[in-house]
Amino acid sequence: MLKIDKLLSAPHGIAPVLVRRAPKLVLPFAERSKSRLRAVLDNGDEAALFLARGTVLRGGDLLVAEDGSFVEVQAAAEAVLEVRAEDPHALMRAAYHLGNRHTPVEIGRDYLRLEYDAVLADMLQRLGVRAERAELPFEPEAGAYGGGHKHGHDATFAEDYAAAQAVFHEHHGHSHSHSHDHVHDEKCGHKH
């Protein structure tokens, strides 16, 4: 079994001839979002992935096995909804409502693409856009701060929170201290 623990994200600068010769790992988005995975390559070899937590593989990425060999990642065709509209406003409105539902979305120049969901297809059609089922590769946007969507205080919460705060402070122009310049005792007038 091929053990893989390194990722070279596209564009990686590896010679095209080496990429063409590499076996392919063809997976749908849900499988490309796992950091620990056993899979079969297109040449029949088995592979075990041990990647950093939160890693999302994209089509065109290269994996490096312990023996130094390369494996190219390809996004598998899967059931998706392809959303199109007659005008950009309608498409933006659809994107807004999908975002409100925390739905992973691939954003193209004139389309949105999401994992197939009959309920969302109905909602989108009620919004006045075309939502057609198709079998296509799915490459949704990464989270706003580089990771996936998180709820609660999981293993990467502190990192995600720090990244969000850094972006806020860059935009906001200054930081706020939470220290106090007085003694905390029963006479300070507030509870701690």
Swiss-Prot record:
One cellular component term (GO) for this entry is: cytoplasm
Family membership, please give it. Answer: Belongs to the UreE family.
Residues of the region (Disordered) are 170-192
Localization of this protein: Cytoplasm
For bias type Basic and acidic residues, the affected ranges are 178-192
The protein's matches in InterPro entries, at most eight in alphabetical order, are given as:
UreE, UreE_C_dom, UreE_N, UreE_N_sf
Q: Name the source organism.
A: Cupriavidus necator (strain ATCC 17699 / DSM 428 / KCTC 22496 / NCIMB 10442 / H16 / Stanier 337)
Q: What is this protein called?
A: Urease accessory protein UreE
Q: Which GO terms describe its molecular function?
A: nickel cation binding; unfolded protein binding
Task: Name the UniProt key words of this record, in alphabetical order.
Answer: Chaperone, Cytoplasm, Nickel, Nickel insertion
Q: Which NCBIfam families does this entry report, sorted A to Z?
A: PRK13261.1-1, PRK13263.1
Q: Which residues form the signal peptide?
A: none
Q: Which GO terms describe its biological process?
A: protein folding; protein-containing complex assembly; urea metabolic process
User: What is this protein's function per UniProt?
Assistant: Involved in urease metallocenter assembly. Binds nickel. Probably functions as a nickel donor during metallocenter assembly.
Q: Main subcellular localization, coarse class?
A: cytoplasm
* Taxonomic lineage of the native organism: Bacteria, Pseudomonadati, Pseudomonadota, Betaproteobacteria, Burkholderiales
